[in-house]
Amino acid sequence: MLELQKKYWTTLIAAGAVVSCGAAAYAAGFTLPAAPKIAFLYFDQKNDGGWTQAFDEARPKIETAVGMKIPFVEKVPEVAGQIKPAAEQFIQRGYNVIIGTAFGYSDTFKELSEKYPQVAFLNASGTTNGSNLESFYGRTYESQYLCGMIAGAMSKSGKLGFVAAHPIGPVNWTINAYELGALKMNPKATVTVIFTGAWNDPVKERAAAQAMADQGIDVIGQHVDTPTPQIVAQERGIYGTGHHRDLREFAPKATLCSSAWTWEKFLIPELKKVEAGNWQPNPYGAFPGIKDGGTDIACCNTVVPKEVVDKVMAERQAIIDGKHIFAGPLKDTSGKEVVPAGQNLGDAGLWKMDWFLPGVIAQK
């Protein structure tokens, strides 16, 4: 799956079809032939503690906004033979807005969107788009930058850790953003990264977090799907920052903040456009940040001093006002300039990010 993801993103970048909020939409607005009926396809169980649960927590907020109950089906694997019947069961019952939650749904959703041109399809972390299909993902580097600020401020050693799944663009940008945020508060901060090779592997995540604590790291961030790194941080008497959703419920003493999905803020406006008949799917997909909904910081644990929170919230507002996290000059660990002075890293550069800042130490 990892190699397939890399192949997709490389192809999209080469074609110029990288998700971007600024890309031109399809000329004609999509119109449903009947009142909208919305359904979700969940990749995992609804209470997985991370990615899927973030969608399930957004669902009741969406229900309130659109005035209808939204059913879902859990644990739909990234296999066409499972995705297609799950979606078609809803379509045959009159559901005409299908929301998916997995990269591996991309090709099947494209096929379904062509087979059912009067049904609207949206898919999180997907790569395919069309006149009635829009993939979307969030600018998580923005929220991870803010978490990095808190980590840098709260660390006594200046040694931060980060448990990550795979060294691919959307993970690497969270790591580099975390380091940039930490440097904002502590110019000597470093981030040691251990890749687990899996999105959801509590055993490997625990081993990675334990190894970090053994090295004297006193704040652990993450881009994996379970709260295990936060649980280990609490067990070891150190701090952590979460990902996907507010993870303080699992480690109330340790988790300082989280980079959290706020999908209702993105999906409610999109669904209202679908209902109004003026939805124009972005041909390159949607890429919302804090300003547009999709991602934000869940802040903060009461142990974080007010002056730190105030600085973080000021940076959050600066991001909303247009500040770009990856503003040059920036160099990678080899000393190569990756973002020139006076320039910002564009979306294509974000998706293909394969470099780390000098303060990032990647371990196997």
Regions found by a protein language model. Give the residues of each.
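Bacterial N-terminal signal peptides that target proteins for export
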Residues: 3-13
